From Swiss-Prot:
EC number(s) given by UniProt: 1.1.1.58
SUPFAM superfamilies: 6-phosphogluconate dehydrogenase C-terminal domain-like, NAD(P)-binding Rossmann-fold domains
Keyword vocabulary terms for this entry: NAD, Oxidoreductase
Enzyme class per UniProt: oxidoreductase
Organism: Clostridium acetobutylicum (strain ATCC 824 / DSM 792 / JCM 1419 / IAM 19013 / LMG 5710 / NBRC 13948 / NRRL B-527 / VKM B-1787 / 2291 / W)
Database matches in PANTHER family: ALTRONATE OXIDOREDUCTASE-RELATED, MANNITOL-1-PHOSPHATE 5-DEHYDROGENASE
Protein name: Altronate oxidoreductase
Residues the record lists as binding NAD(+): 18-29
Record field: catalytic activity: D-altronate + NAD(+) = keto-D-tagaturonate + NADH + H(+)
Gene Ontology, cellular component aspect: cytosol
Gene3D superfamilies assigned to the protein according to its UniProt record, in alphabetical order: N-(1-d-carboxylethyl)-l-norvaline Dehydrogenase, domain 2, NAD(P)-binding Rossmann-like Domain
InterPro entries membership: 6-PGluconate_DH-like_C_sf (IPR008927), 6PGD_dom2 (IPR013328), Altronate_OxRdtase (IPR023668), Mannitol_DH (IPR000669), Mannitol_DH_C (IPR013118), Mannitol_DH_N (IPR013131), NAD(P)-bd_dom_sf (IPR036291)
Length: 482
């Protein structure tokens, strides 16, 4: 039996209020799940029309199931491993604007439409000068949205109360601002009246956002077991972790439109998304990158096993709480709560997150994710953070390319791999040689955007740690910073 509204008549059809660009796993497991929760727990009463941003997509499959699909959420919830599933029923239909262009534009004539959501990948918010305003669909997402907004502007004669709340989820910095700027470029390219540009500025609200949920997506390897468990066929099963966070930079009145507090979903409306983005990069991504060389050389292979390990788990926890959190400008309790949630996510028993999959481009990752914490810690405390410095030394050892007798498959820029190959191939075991390796790596300004040898005490500390790691092995060396 197939999942659709004929076979399952208990599902409600909601009035269409949300236009969503993107039908992929992430939006369905993140935004649509939250809309579903708000519908069921807070009487949001909002239906989502999904527009596929590319010619090839899933809307035909979505329409075959009348917008219904099953979402599994699996991971740790308040310390317990939880796997739960539900049918999401907020999607009313899907449209392919390449074959249904006029039907797509007609959505703009619906006075109840009030929100635009999108996730068209990092490359999606782009200006395409070949896009035209005519009878055929534009290629770019901002081009399509400009055409939609222009139809709305014309239909309602520039009524300022008919503007949209526009919330892009693309993983680029200042995504709302970039989308708005691109739309205004199209207004100029198409020679649209100045009143339209004014209406875009004054009647519409573009929000910058940060989204956070790991979504493995369609469970290809276990789909037969999933269908057997469900008792029906679903071609759009989706899988996400329990944790979710949606930070929206925008006005307070968004809380009146999205009843997230009543529904118990983790949406935060803030004045500035920047510290939240910094928090995620420094704590979540920074913890990953600082962990990899230490845990891998210790003999561990996954993030979960690393956090479970008595020594490495303690090392990582202390690194996050004692060395990263003190460098961030958000309320301490909020940072500690976020860090606790991150470490819990790392323990997700349903996901095998391999250290080597995170190890890709570790040098530039350390520069963007961990170096800012190291520098800020030194600035605020007047001393170096022991564990971040140790992780940096472990990174240099990692790029030796050996774990015991096995080779490490290093993956980084050609220049970085050459640098390390040259340094370690000339290694003669003397303390002077260790120091030369450290000085050369820390002085590689192309990666660090500065000469790290100029940071007081860093060259000595990294050299001392590198000697311990290389001579004693990671299991012994890590004890010195605990």
């Amino acid at each position: 039996m197939k999942l659709n509204r004929s076979n399952f008549s208990e599902f409600k059809k909601y009035p269409e209020k949300i236009l969503q660009f993107g039908e992929g796993n992430f939006l369905r497991a993140f935004v649509d799940w939250q809309v579903d929760r708000m519908n069921k727990a807070a009487d949001f009463n909002a239906g989502v029309v999904i527009v596929q941003p590319l010619e090839q997509g899933l809307v035909d499959m979505l329409n075959e199931q009348d917008g219904l699909y099953t979402l599994y959420l699996q991971g740790l919830k308040e310390g317990k491993a939880v796997k739960e599933h539900s049918v999401i029923d907020c999607v009313t239909r899907g449209l392919n604007p390449y074959t249904q262009y006029e039907e797509y534009l007609k959505l703009a004539e619906n006075p109840e439409m009030e929100i635009v959501i999108s996730n068209t990948t990092e490359a999606g918010i782009a200006f395409d000068e070949n896009d035209k305003l005519g009878r055929t669909c534009q290629n770019s997402y901002p081009g399509k949205l400009t055409a939609f907004l222009y139809r709305r502007f014309k239909t309602f004669n520039g009524d300022k109360s008919k503007g949209m709340l526009i919330i892009p989820c693309e993983l680029i910095d200042r995504n709302g601002e970039k989308l708005k700027a691109t739309i205004l470029k199209f207004a100029e390219l198409w020679n649209l009246e100045k009143e339209f540009a004014d209406w875009i500025e004054e009647a519409n609200t573009f929000c910058c956002t940060l989204v956070d949920r790991i979504v493995p997506g369609y469970p290809r390897d276990t789909i037969e077991e999933v269908h057997a468990e469900l008792g029906y066929e679903d071609s759009l099963v989706d899988v996400g972790e329990q944790f979710h966070l949606w930070v929206i930079e925008g006005p307070e009145w968004i809380k009146d439109i999205l009843p997230f507090e009543k529904a118990g979903v983790n949406i935060q409306v803030v004045k500035d998304v920047t510290p939240y983005r910094t928090r995620k990069v420094r704590i979540l991504n920074g913890a990953h990158t600082a962990l990899v060389p230490v845990a891998y050389l210790y003999g561990l292979d996954t993030v979960g096993h690393s956090v479970e390990d008595k020594v490495i788990g303690k090392y990582l926890t202390e690194l996050v709480y004692d060395e990263i959190i003190p460098t961030l400008d958000l309320p301490e309790e909020e940072l500690k709560y976020f860090a606790g949630a991150v470490l819990e996510r790392f323990l997700n028993p349903f996901v095998n997150h391999y250290l080597m999959s995170i190890a890709l481009n570790s040098m530039p990752k350390f520069e963007t994710r961990d170096l800012p914490s190291l520098l800020e810690y030194k600035k605020r405390k007047g001393q170096l953070p022991k564990k971040l410095v140790f992780s940096l030394a472990a990174l240099i050892e990692f790029y030796k390319g050996k774990r015991g007798d096995e080779d490490i498959k290093l993956a980084d820029g050609e220049d970085i791999l050459e640098l390390y190959k040259d340094l370690w191939s000339k290694f003669d075991g003397t303390d002077a040689c260790y120091r030369n390796i450290v000085e050369t790596v820390l002085g590689y300004e192309k990666n660090w955007k500065m000469n790290l040898n100029e940071l007081e005490g860093l060259t000595d500390a990294v050299t001392e740690n590198l000697i311990k790691i290389d001579k004693l092995g990671m299991k012994e060396a890590v004890k010195s910073v605990m």
